[in-house]
Amino acid sequence: MSKGAWSKFPYAEKAYIYTGAALKKNWDRLHRGDAEPWPDDESVQEAWRLYHQGEFQKAAESGLKAGIAGYAAANKATAIYANYLEKDAGRKLALFEEVARRAEEQQKAEPKYPNAYYLHAYALGRYSQGISVVKALAQGLGGKIKDSLTKAIKPTAPRRMKASNTSPRPSSSIPIPPSPASNMPTPW
């Protein structure tokens, strides 16, 4: 993991602190966009708790200590931090590379876990924007992003629709209600 202290989350407030059972109670709302399943492992729960209160560095460290089971929390914390809070361009790219590498490890260990593919694509996409799309395409990143997104979306489409409480839109005249906002902007 990238060395040095990360910038503090500038919007810290009590509403983002989910102590005890509050995290589980709010889980579906907080993870409506990514359909992340509730983790049984308490150390992974703690990593997510830290993520949701904006303690991104601690969340990443906690997720990594939990092993593969904590990679989703570590990767999401790192990717969201890098995208929204890291000011140094070189460090931002290094963080996205870390997420992509860990996501590849997780894909090998858990080949049917959709968020390993989604976070891989997200990290490579943001990395690509940082180095220029032309350079990224020359490195073959476009194909890797497409492959990961295909694997993330295709097998989970019904689950993701259920998680977001929407159904396929048969016509444009049927409104689909927006998801309630979680404590951070979500990338989807």
Which residue ranges define each predicted feature?
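N-terminal alpha-helical interaction modules that lie
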Residues: 1-117, 127, 139-153, 170-176
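Sparse recognition of residues in long alpha-helices and their boundaries
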Residues: 91, 136-137, 179, 186
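Hydrophobic face of amphipathic alpha-helices that form TPR/SEL1-like repeat modules
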Residues: 78, 123-129, 187-188
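TPR/Sel1-like alpha-solenoid repeat signature
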Residues: 117-120, 148, 166, 181-188
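Extracellular loop and loop/strand-boundary signature of outer-membrane beta-barrel proteins
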Residues: 132-137, 156
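Histidine/lysine/aspartate-rich catalytic loop segments that bind and position anionic ligands
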Residues: 153-158, 162
